[in-house]
Amino acid sequence: LIRVNILNARSKNQAKKIAFSIANSPLVKTAVAGEDANWGRVIMAIGKTEENINQNKVKVLFGSNIVCENGSISKKINIEKLNNYMKNKTIEINVKLYMGKFYQTVYGNDLTYEYLKINADYRS
């Protein structure tokens, strides 16, 4: 299970649009399935919304693990702690935009090889 929390958005609509873009991204889903805290894929999902944000203010966390802040990789990453976190059944992706007071939480699922294989082999 993936829980995406968008915080400090300019509007409720902006928060919702970005949250769903992250939760529905096949690249984010496969990264989570592979236990990879790939913050670049999160940033890509934000960017494809074409929402006007300040990329130099964005902070991305997996759980409480800061992976990106001020538009670049965080110097505070604890790889061991982050890798352990990514083994959890529920992964929380927190994005702080620092643009306003609005927030949105959405849920999604990962995308595993097993899921793809089952559905690729399925015939109706």
What are the roles of these predicted feature ranges?
Residues 8, 13-124:
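Internal helix-turn-beta structural module
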